Amino acid sequence: MSKLDLNALNELPKVDRILALAETNAELEKLDAEGRVAWALDNLPGEYVLSSSFGIQAAVSLHLVNQIHPDIPVILTDTGYLFPETYRFIDELTDKLKLNLKVYRATESAAWQEARYGKLWEQGVEGIEKYNDINKVEPMNRALKELNAQTWFAGLRREQSGSRANLPVLAIQRGVFKVLPIIDWDNRTIYQYLQKHGLKYHPLWDEGYLSVGDTHTTRKWEPGMSEEETRFFGLKRECGLHEG
């Protein structure tokens, strides 16, 4: 696999970018997760960042990437509406894994947003998308810019939802390389990694949550529900960070 030119790839239409990365992705599919991270650090430009929502399985990618590239900036976009358990989980993992945590928030506080727009998450798909743009997308774009990121690691997995089922290991999003080291892991592999390294699921896992985001758009799993239906009232799966 040869070195990739980010600037040249960004000038291509999206379809052509996908085709240009196809050969590299075919090779990356043959590597294990650690190998993919090592390859990215050797062949893709810095600065490097890792994003995390500190959700159910967050400890896996946080541990895996940070072990190979210690002190990598870890981007959290904090909406102000996370579960108390999530905030405590963030503190616990930051201390345990010695994370270089970088927290980004919307330029408007949660209270100010409610005063201006009402409860956007109760206003259908359009309201949810506006909420996500304000609280997730803009802060992430700002983080990537301020941290001079050119390569972005994330912990998405194909098994999590239909919208992620065909994602490649390597893509370009928001103008930077995006690497998904554990994209092909299943739930058993996640469990085995956590057990091997003495790591925990998010505390709400034991209470029946399969996915955890904001308090007002996360539901506990019930029989017959898919994981996708536990977020955003089943209207959306993605919060906007991993779209586009």
From Swiss-Prot:
Keywords: Cytoplasm, Oxidoreductase. Its EC number is 1.8.4.8. One of its GO terms (cellular component) is cytoplasm. One of its GO terms (biological process) is hydrogen sulfide biosynthetic process. Its main location: cytoplasm. It is an enzyme of class 1 (oxidoreductase). Transmembrane segments: none annotated. One of its GO terms (molecular function) is phosphoadenylyl-sulfate reductase (thioredoxin) activity. Pfam families: PAPS_reduct (PF01507). The active site is at residue 239. It catalyses: [thioredoxin]-disulfide + sulfite + adenosine 3',5'-bisphosphate + 2 H(+) = [thioredoxin]-dithiol + 3'-phosphoadenylyl sulfate. Pathway: Sulfur metabolism; hydrogen sulfide biosynthesis; sulfite from sulfate: step 3/3. InterPro entries: PAPS/APS_Rdtase, PAPS_reduct_dom, PAPS_reductase_CysH, Rossmann-like_a/b/a_fold. PANTHER family: PHOSPHOADENOSINE PHOSPHOSULFATE REDUCTASE. Catalyzes the formation of sulfite from phosphoadenosine 5'-phosphosulfate (PAPS) using thioredoxin as an electron donor. Belongs to the PAPS reductase family. CysH subfamily. NCBIfam families: cysH, PAPS_reductase, PRK02090.1. This is Phosphoadenosine 5'-phosphosulfate reductase. It comes from Escherichia coli O139:H28 (strain E24377A / ETEC). The gene is cysH.
